[in-house]
Amino acid sequence: MLDLVCKVWYMNRRCLSIGFCGLIIAIFGFLPTVAQELYVFSDPASTKPARSIGIKHSFQKMGGNTNRNNQYTQMQFGLSKKVSLYLGTNYGGNDAYVQYRFFTKDAMYAHTRLAFYAKSIQTNRQAIHTSAVLLDGEESVNGVGFIATQLKHKWASSLSLGYVQKEKWSQHYGRDAFQYSFSNGLLVYPKRYSSYGQTNVNLYLELLGQKLLSGRGQYLDAAPAIQMIFNSQAKLNLGYRFALLEKTNRMTNNSLFISLDYLFFNALPKKKTS
């Protein structure tokens, strides 16, 4: 049944992607300025709550020059109020991500966060057929970067800038790239909070890009998504990512994305005080 739904989705992906993206832009333009920052395709500068443990599982139906599925499971740890650690696997390779939030500014119904991050993907696979630096577990990659996130009322925007490098590469394609994203999120429900147990509905539009430092190509993807949060702990995401600009030879450049997250508060032991 899932395969049938995905086939219908891909047959209509051009019309659906343009229509969905246009709908979200229209909604963002006409609703009051409000915010949310739990992005579907990128990470904000805000770290996980201290002493929390999160688990995430996602499924991607990917298409383009070829079709394939990608399953991914990740464990997330809020080591402190400033440091988060993520460990993940796509069952063909493993990755680690650490984030350090070094700046925080809070105001009434608003805040600003700045963070550094580092990421490493390790796999036996080698994507020698593409010039792009792939971040979905198809090749071993290391990277570092910077994230700036600002929230105001129920609207949040985030900018990330990073450098990524393949561990193995072909001389014909190069080895490193400049990675960037610009993400926006809007909380559309509830209109007014009465408890932490209320269901939240968020809409997102993210731009995800890469410029090869060898000068041999670049891409820019758009990724609209909808998100539901239950009891401030469980999160269901549904998104679609597609290419706006494609000047690399990626084998897959569009995907239907579904993920489920669950967060356990105060799951890690408190630090002992001397």
Residue ranges of model-derived segments:
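Transmembrane beta-barrel domains of Gram-negative outer membranes and organellar outer membranes
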Residues: 35-159, 163-167, 172, 177-274
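Cleavable N-terminal export/targeting peptides
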Residues: 1-41, 265-274
